[in-house]
Amino acid sequence: MALVGKIHREDKIMQTWLKLIGSAKKPLTHPEYKGRWDEEYIGFRKTRKPSIRSGDYLFLYAPGGTKSIFAVAEATSDPEINAQYNPEEEGSCYWNVNVTYLINLPVNSGIHIEEITTKQRNLSKSIQRQSHIQLSVEESRLACDKLQRKLKG
């Protein structure tokens, strides 16, 4: 089944999200990450519980110089409080969501965020100062198609 068909099945009403990974101070191109993100979870820094639920899909976005959407992952858990959360530590996340990757490219091999911007919304502006935003069906279909093309080469 194509990725679009998996994510947008009529019998399965799940949400799709654009989720920032990394930061301006520590982008995914930082030597520590080696241009990849392959953790088994996605972290959320704010103390308010994220709306993401098990079965939802997250398109991972590196906002640094690449402005690249490089992965799509399925949430395999609801948000859980991170037992290692430390408010004194830069980048420590209050919530974690476990994920399974459907596509996970090196950051520099992803698609530019402008490639899925539609007439209805400029995603670059919408995601500013947010950790994640819900995507429209059109936006997530575009992201699926373009990521699959990148994967096939």
Please name every model-derived segment:
Residues 27-29, 52, 68, 77, ...:
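Residues in flexible loops and secondary-structure boundaries
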Residues 66-72:
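Short, Lys/Arg- and Gly-enriched loop/turn segments at beta-strand edges
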Residues 1-54, 63, 118-121, 135-153:
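Compositionally biased, charged N-terminal/linker segments
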Residues 74-138:
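Aromatic- and Lys/Arg-enriched surface recognition patch
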Residues 72-73, 79-80, 148, 153:
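Alpha-helix boundary/interfacial micro-motifs
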